[in-house]
Amino acid sequence: MNSVNSIRSTFLDYFHLNGHKVLSSSPLVPRNDPTLMFTNAGMVQFKNVFTGLEQRPCKQATTAQKCVRVGGKHNDLDNVGYTARHHTFFEMLGNFSFSDYFKEEAIFLSWNLLTKEFCLPKDKLLVTVYHSDDVAAELWRKISNLSDEKIVRIATVDNFWAMGETGPCGPCSEIFYDHGDEIWGGPPGSANEGGDRFIEIWNLVFMQYEQVSKEERVELPHPSIDTGMGLERIAAVLQGVHDNYDIDLFRALIGASQEITGVEATGDFIASHRVISDHLRSCAFLIADGVLPSNEGRGYVLRRIMRRAMRHAHFLGVKEPLMWRLLPVLVREMGQAYPELVRAESLISETLKLEEMRFRKTLERGLGLLNEASSNLKEGDHFNGEIAFKLYDTYGFPLDLTQDALRCRGISVDVDAFDKAMQRQKTEARANWSGSGEAVTETIWFAVRDRVGATEFLGYEIEKAEGIITALICDGKVVDHISSGQKAIIVVNQTPFYGESGGQIGDSGIISSGCFVFEVHDTQKKSNGVFIHIGEVKSGQAKTFECVELTVDVVRRQKIRANHSATHLLHEALRQILGPHVTQKGSLVLPDRLRFDFSHPKSVSSEELKKIEDLANDIVLQNSEVTTHLMALDDAISEGAMALFGEKYGDEVRVVSMGNPLEPEGLKKRWSIELCGGTHVERTGDIGLIHIVSESSVAAGVRRIEALTGTAARLYFNRQDERIREISSLLKTVPADVGERVSNLLHEYNRLSQACIELRKKIILSGNTIKNNQEDITIINGISFMGRVVRNILPRDLKALVDDGKKQIGSGVVAFISVAENGKGSAVVGVTNDLTDKLNAVNLIHILSDVLGGKGGGGRPDMAQSGGPEGDKAVGALAALRASLEKI
């Protein structure tokens, strides 16, 4: 069978046999392209190759690239589930030539694969060429024997590809498949080309020009090839179906969705099952590549996708988290091709489950409000954009969910009104905000770099060096000298000072000459390679182009080194104890402590923290050598080095290795191997000791540990030991017995506290606590009523009193009001079960709440609570309740 997995393998094997190097898919978050939110095409990882900024050892490559298209020019989100071919996540199969073969070979390779390997009927295929590309048209005739009617010339920009306003560009040739005349639609270039009969399955881009300016385009001396074939589309063709959602992969996901929900994928429910299956793929792969749900950037897009799927799960009647239950099916179907899914399965599962649980209340409330606000609308109407904004701003219900929920009823949202409301809020927010007054901009560092070049870093080998001052900055301006007492920035041609980056704080120390002393408080490394030394002139006057001596604070740096090396050991220990899904999400390396943020869906238990700490300290005790090597990025990754998500790496990287494996770990020769530009200890024993002092949550799916090393850890234990001795002295016991002694005291305290509570309840229920209480129990309209005012009783204890009161009267109503020291009143009303058919505690509590100045209240028919600021009206509140019972 032509399964998705076999088609992918056939494609890659075919091009491998034809001289192409098979390369892995790049992550969904582009490593070196800030212009893209997500990887959306196969050529993204080769962008710098095509522009000449990067060289690859191979001239021909082939990939199966995972892609996400949501937002910007390529935004398929709103259409997903309602068409046969739109997806948020898809795979793009591609072959690439970097200044090697060109049009003839590209056309031959594509035609041969489709007709010989995939055995597609030639009469089902037709192609397009750019209207002026006579060479491509002639090559198609020669290679395929297609008639002129099957080689369609297209004059629109759709058949001419450009990377941007400038850069490589060229004509395209698209290959279409004819699904048959039973499906409406015409061939490309016709009036009915928007139909679904003729579907593009492959696009060949002939990069033969460079766009120099808007008016000028020149021939490239060495043209290239970039092609892209949608795997889901070709799978539909080869499996004999017209709809992408009918291929084996989606059949498996939708089948599982039907089984779990108990709802067939028919009628109005088809789109929901499709949305869930598609969105599961994009969510799972984004999480596997390090994106976690948040309220900004990529994390916000992920959250939008997840919540759209949740809305459709809600439409299917699902009351519990669904997507995580479908994940094992996705891993089974795609895990072999993409092992990152297997590695991150537990993280993906927990993230999906937690996000769905968090959003469920918002979803239910938002849909309820939306249904209420749109109840009078009919098909073709517009929903008020101001109300849509209120749903978003007040209740956290996103616009796209409002649109999606109304779409099935044929109702659109007034987006212009929504945007105006959003803009009005932003304008008001800006009016209430005042800036920081920061005068220095980043442009100054580019000017310095252009004038004097980047700073050479010497600090891996030495901590003292000589250099020449190349720039002085004071009050945000470049100056030629600085004097005693001035706070300023010094730039030197070379420095041993480490500039803050990769989470490691910058060095401090002294820059001096015979004429001045400058105290460096911090060192920063700017993105263009300029190191800036921030500090204050302590004496004398410094001038540009003066020869100086730079001396790093060695003691401080040693502490930083120990903490940085400890983060590497903790990172690996976290992965070994919690699982390979753990990846670094942030770090802070200071002289006195370290902080490490990592991906993990739930809190780390005390037992797990102890195992992590013990494992890291085992490597410290090895006292093994810490080594650094420069090597090619691909070689480093193949040797097991961990690349940090979101970091940009060049062709050559610095690899830091430490520790010997505690057990055989395949080809991995060192315990921890990471790409890192920071400073580290010479041997793991130099760390001394690692102690984790806290574990907490940073964001959904991100945890944080803080730790101490060396002297800081020793001092921490000394302080703890001193505290234990002080406590043991107070408890009149030895330190070893402190735990048992405290446990006994707590047990006795709890026993006495409970005894006090029971005694107080007896006193209150006896009716002798406050003068204004009515005597015992009164009968009103045949209903027994106990109403009392008490002092300083907590709400939870007040409930217990009401329960006891209900037992005491057997049948009737019990109302207690507790007046606190601050004058506020807390009220609880109880109704015995035999009376709840005619008396509701929620209605009765509202009477008390109104008198106490409160806002309603809530609960069950047999028990409700409320309160208010006017506790001095407690007696009047009980009187109002009695009066109400008299009217029944």
UniProtKB/Swiss-Prot annotation:
EC id: 6.1.1.7
GO CC aspect terms: cytosol
EC category name: ligase
Superkingdom of origin organism: Bacteria
PROSITE patterns with a match to the protein in the record: AA_TRNA_LIGASE_II_ALA
One record GO biological process: alanyl-tRNA aminoacylation
UniProt organism field: Bartonella quintana (strain Toulouse) (Rochalimaea quintana)
Pfam families documented for this protein: DHHA1 (PF02272), tRNA-synt_2c (PF01411), tRNA_SAD (PF07973)
Cofactor(s) listed in the protein's UniProt record: Zn(2+)
Molecular function in Gene Ontology: alanine-tRNA ligase activity; aminoacyl-tRNA deacylase activity; ATP binding; tRNA binding; zinc ion binding
Keyword list, A-Z: Aminoacyl-tRNA synthetase, ATP-binding, Cytoplasm, Ligase, Metal-binding, Nucleotide-binding, Protein biosynthesis, RNA-binding, tRNA-binding, Zinc
SUPFAM superfamilies (UniProt xref): Class II aaRS and biotin synthetases, Putative anticodon-binding domain of alanyl-tRNA synthetase (AlaRS), ThrRS/AlaRS common domain, Translation proteins
InterPro entries with a match to the protein in the record: aa-tRNA-synth_II/BPL/LPL (IPR045864), Ala-tRNA-lgiase_IIc (IPR002318), Ala-tRNA-ligase_IIc_anticod-bd (IPR018162), Ala-tRNA-synth_IIc_core (IPR018165), Ala-tRNA-synth_IIc_N (IPR018164), Ala-tRNA_ligase (IPR050058), Ala_tRNA_ligase_euk/bac (IPR023033), DHHA1_dom (IPR003156)
Main localization (coarse): cytoplasm
Family stated for the protein in its record: Belongs to the class-II aminoacyl-tRNA synthetase family.
Note on domains (UniProt): Consists of three domains; the N-terminal catalytic domain, the editing domain and the C-terminal C-Ala domain. The editing domain removes incorrectly charged amino acids, while the C-Ala domain, along with tRNA(Ala), serves as a bridge to cooperatively bring together the editing and aminoacylation centers thus stimulating deacylation of misacylated tRNAs.
Cofactor note: Binds 1 zinc ion per subunit.
PANTHER family referenced in this protein's UniProt entry, alphabetically: ALANINE--TRNA LIGASE, CYTOPLASMIC (PTHR11777:SF9), ALANYL-TRNA SYNTHETASE (PTHR11777)
Protein name, as recorded: Alanine--tRNA ligase
Catalytic activity line of the entry: tRNA(Ala) + L-alanine + ATP = L-alanyl-tRNA(Ala) + AMP + diphosphate
Chain residues that bind Zn(2+): H564, H568, C676, H680
Compartment(s) where it occurs, according to its Swiss-Prot or TrEMBL record: Cytoplasm
Free-text function comment from the UniProt entry: Catalyzes the attachment of alanine to tRNA(Ala) in a two-step reaction: alanine is first activated by ATP to form Ala-AMP and then transferred to the acceptor end of tRNA(Ala). Also edits incorrectly charged Ser-tRNA(Ala) and Gly-tRNA(Ala) via its editing domain.
Alphabetized CDD domains for the sequence: AlaRS_core (cd00673)
Upper taxonomic lineage: Bacteria, Pseudomonadati, Pseudomonadota, Alphaproteobacteria, Hyphomicrobiales
